[in-house]
Regions:
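Conserved catalytic core of nucleotide polymerization and phosphodiester-bond processing enzymes
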Residues: 1-290
Length: 290
């Protein structure tokens, strides 16, 4: 049904839709933020992150992870690990990402988790650094700066609210309302804060940890990358009619090309030096998933 609903969106008369999104945006952002050098090098060269991840995890030359070779089966493990494990997830994260439907067994999942974390030590360090910085702010009320992020406690005097904030490389901030420290269900001291429950739609308390905060930060930076692209598209005189996650949908004149838009998405961002971005897309007479 959702596929049919998408096709109801059509461009204005005489125009076409140009649809483009970022390729592997979260994998690119987290590697850039953490300084995971080998991942950044993959994105700067061939871009085969699933094959490269499998190569790192299983110590197999990447050239062997190709169709027709028995080692090609490792690509699936590299893919699901890349998609599922960037935010401190374990076996359950792999299962949620469909690992068992990909032919993997539950028994081999802990090994995949361990291999991925060993291959990505700087991303693993990022999780713990984020958690330690947030806890330090809560315990000392002093700002903490790590990885081009600034953690702080801020207050709204007018409304009597307090926030744990994280200033992103762009200068924008994430806000965690009414934060406090309390033991979580695992008996570990953790940050708790108020959020609107997805089911209840009411304010309720939730806890967080390094990996989850890293996810918030990475996805927020990815959003800021999208905002830069929206500005560039607007500066070209083109109209973005809507955007979905990291995807832009442009009501474009016939002469506009997909390559033109992808080039805008790949341009360097001043506040993110060294972040390598890439766009991919298509054009058509109605909206759809590529």
């Amino acid at each position: 049904l959702s596929q049919l609903i998408r096709t109801a969106f059509i461009p204005s008369e005489g125009n076409k839709f140009v649809v483009a999104d970022f390729s592997a945006i979260e994998a690119r952002v987290i590697a850039w933020l953490a300084g995971e050098t080998w991942v950044n090098e993959v994105f700067a060269t061939h871009g085969k992150i699933y094959e490269a991840t499998a190569s790192q995890m299983f110590h197999v030359p990447i050239e062997k992870i190709a169709k027709g070779n028995p080692e090609y089966a490792l690509r699936q493990k590299g893919k699901v690990a890349t998609l599922a494990l960037g935010y401190q997830g374990g076996s359950n994260a792999l299962i949620a990402m469909g690992a068992l439907n990909m032919g993997l067994t539950e028994e081999e999942l802990p090994d995949i988790v361990q291999r991925w974390r060993t291959a990505n030590p700087r991303i693993r360090d990022l999780w713990y650094a984020v958690e330690e910085a947030a806890l330090a702010v809560m315990q000392t009320a002093q700002p903490q700066a790590i990885y081009n992020l600034i953690f702080n406690l801020e207050s709204d005097i007018v409304y009597g609210q307090s926030f744990l904030t994280v200033q992103l490389p762009s200068g924008r901030k994430l806000y965690y309302p009414r934060p406090f420290l309390k033991e979580n269900q695992f008996g570990k001291m953790a940050i708790h804060y108020y959020t609107v429950g997805q089911q209840t739609r009411k304010w309720e308390v939730t806890s967080t940890y390094g990996g989850k905060m890293t996810e918030n930060i990475v996805q927020a930076i990815a959003r800021d990358c999208l905002a830069e692209t929206l500005r560039r598209i607007d500066a070209k005189g083109l109209q973005v009619v809507f955007h979905v996650h990291d995807e832009v949908i442009i009501d474009a004149p016939a002469g506009t090309t997909v390559e033109e838009i992808c080039d805008l998405m790949a341009e360097p961002i001043a506040w993110a030096p060294g972040l390598i971005l890439k766009g991919a897309g298509f054009e058509g007479n109605y909206y759809m998933k590529d």
